[in-house]
C-alpha cells in the first residue's frame, strides 16, 4: 500500500534469490551494528543445512517491470545480471530456521543494493510484509494488514505468526522458494525470516 511505498522501494534492493545445488530460497542483505557493508545474507536454515555454502549463488535485482500483482504467473522477467557466487556460514539455528551467511565478495557499489535494518525488540508491528522470490519467480510482495501473533514455537523460542499464514496474506502468497525471505515490520525493518508458510 501507499503507507509502505518508500520502505518497499528501499528494502526490495536488499532481497535476493539464493541458488543452491538442487534448490532455491529467498533472503536479504542485512546490516550489522557497525554499518560497514559486510555482505551478510539472512535466509532460512533448512535451505543451508548440510549444504556447502561456498557453492551458493545469489541473484539480486530480479524485479519485473510489469509484475502481475499477487500472482506467480503473468509477470515479465527483468534483468538477471547482478549475480555473485560463494559464501561462508556465519551462524545458524535450526529451532528458528535461521541462517546467516557472509557472501565471500563485496557487493559491487554499481548494483545499488542496500543492507536492511532490523529490530529485535519484540515490539508487535502494525502489519508485516515479506519480499521474496516464490518458486524462483521474479520478486514478489506479500502483506498481512494485521499485527502478527507472537507465539511459543519451540519453548522458549517465540516467533511471529502471520494469522492464517497458509492463505492468510491480505496481498500475495508465499510458497517454496519464499523460504528465508525477510519479514519486515511497518517501519521497514527485518523482524524475522519466512519459515513454514
Label the model's feature ranges.
Residues 28-36, 172-195:
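Catalytic nucleophile loop of clan PA
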Residues 20, 128, 170-173, 185:
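Exposed boundary/loop context
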Residues 1, 168-169:
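Active-site-adjacent structural elements in folded domains
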Residues 1-162:
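Serine endopeptidase catalytic core focused on the charge-relay Asp
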